């Protein structure tokens, strides 16, 4: 009888503990002019985009989360941006314990996985809105480049985006709602999307986003963060003294210059997420090996060849070996 009673008490305590954690964990993210405040202190995003897919796979996996978090902490990362929600309390708890916060991204049509189209994103917010690791709710990822996903009319996306943001505010008033836009939006769109509290911008303007920051200063008073920025570690052509082929120096140099611009303009921008933490070998061909793949040279503003080789963007490689840019980011994030 005593054993049964003890087990019953343990069960009750565990349930109460779980409810206490989910109900009473306090985090409040506010906006003050162009800044994010976490529990009344300014929070400057020093982040990486995080989409960990293992060698030989095409699906996200957190099997290496412990190793990854250790590397992130060493690099001074305080924020990760994920492209779809993490539905695993144990993973969220590990991220929180590491002192890292999450920008949770929701897609429009993810076949019902916490997406906007089905409305299931609301269930995720209800489930995890009190988790200390979550910094921002982010809707979409540069969908403005893809009107074909919205019956050929990008305004269909903007309407869905603004409505989804409104629904989030009804569920969780403790965090801002953002979106990740491809390049800078115009003033009219910012005004139209009045439920968006802050803007993330995916920006690839060579190694100098300073013009974009000045543009933002003139069109909006809302907080801005660079939701994607950076460079890959492969040169499709020889250019500017950087040799063709894998070139970690080119990546390191570009990221250093980009980060300098961000930290030197911290009165305008509220942070940056370097794209990305680990190489994605699933993107351009055989997921069992690293493939060269990207657009033709000079077709986009990616330093220093204009070609975004999709499988070479990590600050670490697929085996978690540090690239040269890792030390650059570590220095900048830990000393700013």
Located regions from the model:
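Bacterial Sec-dependent signal peptides at the C-terminal "C-region" and cleavage site
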Residues: 12-28
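Active-site mouth of glycoside hydrolases
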Residues: 36-205, 209-210, 217-221
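Active-site clefts of carbohydrate-active enzymes
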Residues: 144-150, 220-262, 274-286
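A short, compositionally biased
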Residues: 28-34
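Aromatic-rich peripheral "rim/lid" segments of glycoside hydrolase catalytic domains that contact
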Residues: 275-336
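Soluble or luminal CAZymes and related metallo-dependent hydrolases
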Residues: 64, 116-120, 156-160, 208, ...
């Amino acid at each position: 009888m005593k054993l049964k009673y003890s087990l019953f008490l343990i069960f009750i305590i565990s349930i109460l503990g779980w409810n206490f954690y989910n109900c009473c964990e306090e985090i409040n993210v506010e906006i003050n002019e162009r800044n994010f405040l976490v529990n009344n202190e300014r929070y400057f995003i020093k982040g990486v985009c995080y989409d960990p897919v293992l060698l030989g796979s095409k699906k996200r996996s957190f099997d290496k989360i412990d190793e990854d978090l250790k590397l992130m902490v060493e690099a001074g990362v305080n924020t990760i941006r994920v492209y779809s929600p993490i539905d695993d309390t144990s993973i969220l708890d590990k991220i929180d314990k590491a002192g890292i916060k999450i920008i949770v991204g929701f897609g429009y049509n993810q076949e019902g996985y916490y997406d906007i189209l089905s409305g299931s994103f609301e269930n995720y917010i209800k489930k995890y809105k009190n988790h200390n690791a979550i910094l921002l709710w982010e809707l979409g990822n540069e969908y403005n480049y893809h009107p074909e996903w919205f019956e050929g009319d990008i305004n269909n996306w903007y309407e869905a985006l603004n409505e989804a943001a409104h629904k989030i505010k009804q569920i969780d008033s403790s965090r801002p709602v953002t979106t990740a836009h491809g390049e800078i939006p115009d003033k009219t769109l910012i005004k139209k999307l009045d439920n968006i509290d802050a803007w993330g911008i995916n920006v690839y303007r060579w190694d100098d986003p300073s013009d974009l920051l000045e543009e933002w200063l003139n069109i909006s008073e809302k907080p801005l963060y660079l939701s994607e920025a950076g460079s890959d570690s492969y040169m499709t052509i020889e250019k500017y003294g950087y040799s063709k082929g894998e070139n970690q120096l080119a990546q390191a140099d570009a990221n250093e210059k980009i980060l300098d611009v961000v930290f030197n303009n911290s009165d305008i921008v509220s942070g940056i997420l370097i794209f990305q933490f680990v190489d994605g070998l699933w993107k351009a061909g055989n997921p069992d090996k690293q493939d060269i793949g990207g657009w033709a040279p000079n077709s986009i503003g990616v330093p220093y060849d204009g070609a975004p080789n999709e499988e070479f963007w990590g600050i670490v490689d697929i085996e978690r070996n540090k690239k040269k840019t890792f030390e650059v980011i570590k220095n900048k994030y830990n000393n700013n």
